[in-house]
Structure formats: C-alpha cells, structure tokens
C-alpha cells in the first residue's frame, strides 16, 4: 500500500481509494468458467503446488459470491448467452480473466462457424493469459497483473 505522507506526530495519511483497492486485491474470489482443457490448468493452479489460497484467492461456485470470472477454454456460440448471463449476475466491481488461446481469440478452432473469436466479444476482459493451454504459473501471473490493475483504479467517483 502506498502511503502518501507520514506526519511527525505518528499519523499516516493516504487516500480512501488506496485503502479500498488494497483490500480488494487481497480477497479476490474467482468463479471458474471452465469450457475446455484450460480448465485443468486452472484446477492445477488451485491445487497444493501453487495454492492460490495463500494469496486470498478462493474459488467460489456461484456468480453472486464471486468478483472475478476466469474464462478458460473454447467459447462456442451456444454458450455465449450463458456466459453473459453469468457475468451479469456477478456483483460490482467485477473483473474477467481470459485464459488460453481459445478464450482469447478462438485459438485452434478460430475458423469454425460455431466458435466465438474471443470472449471479449461477449464480456469485457481485463487480463489476457496467453498459451495453449497456459501453465498454472501463467494464470498466477495473470492474477497478479489483475491485482496490480485493481490497485491503480479509482474507486470513488469524483
């Protein structure tokens, strides 16, 4: 947390934005939206070796309990309305991580008539994690980048 100033009497001054964003980065609750093989790597990231719980990241089963959606895998046209519906059920503020080449831009199945060429056509994406499939380390790096993005945002309307 960045502290803007320390007064000589022992007081610490900072902005409310900084405090709110700092607390949000320590308690991200992602909802898994696993569609294909990238979901296995997402489960790998939540297992004992990488243990996302140590960063305050706890996977939630319901969109109403989560604030981050990780879209992992090939998004087809039939699943696109369900993705948008689940995204709309999430509480504000909400963020989206697109994991893997298929979620980012269609991947190997890019030219198929049934594939959406990137989940960013359906929901706004904050962080893209490349790879086919991306490793658990890449997902962890993407989550850290999302935390850095959250720290830089202004939360209070001026």
UniProtKB/Swiss-Prot annotation:
Membrane topology category: Peripheral membrane protein
Any GO BP: aerobic respiration
EC number of the protein: 7.1.1.-
Membrane-spanning ranges: none
Cofactors, names only: [4Fe-4S] cluster
Keyword Cell membrane: yes
InterPro entries xrefs: NADH_UbQ_OxRdtase-like_20kDa, NADH_UQ_OxRdtase_20Kd_su
Localization (cell): Cell inner membrane
Chief location bin: membrane
Primary role: NDH-1 shuttles electrons from NADH, via FMN and iron-sulfur (Fe-S) centers, to quinones in the respiratory chain. Couples the redox reaction to proton translocation (for every two electrons transferred, four hydrogen ions are translocated across the cytoplasmic membrane), and thus conserves the redox energy in a proton gradient.
Family: Belongs to the complex I 20 kDa subunit family.
Subunit details: NDH-1 is composed of 14 different subunits. Subunits NuoB, C, D, E, F, and G constitute the peripheral sector of the complex.
Protein name: NADH-quinone oxidoreductase subunit B
């Amino acid at each position: 947390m960045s502290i803007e100033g320390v007064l000589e009497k022992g007081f610490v001054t900072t902005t409310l934005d900084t405090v709110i964003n700092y607390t949000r980065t320590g308690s991200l609750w992602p909802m898994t939206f696993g569609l294909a093989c990238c979901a296995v790597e997402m489960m790998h990231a939540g297992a004992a070796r990488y243990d996302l719980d140590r960063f305050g990241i706890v996977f939630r089963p319901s969109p109403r309990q989560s604030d981050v959606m990780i879209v992992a895998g090939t998004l087809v046209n039939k699943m696109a309305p369900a993705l948008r519906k689940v995204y709309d059920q999430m509480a504000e503020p909400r963020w989206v991580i697109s994991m893997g080449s298929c979620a980012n831009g269609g991947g190997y199945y890019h030219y198929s008539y049934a594939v959406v060429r990137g989940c960013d056509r359906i929901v706004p994406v904050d962080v893209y994690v490349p790879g086919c499939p991306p490793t658990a380390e890449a997902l962890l790096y993407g989550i850290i980048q999302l935390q850095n993005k959250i720290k830089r945002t202004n939360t209070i309307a001026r």
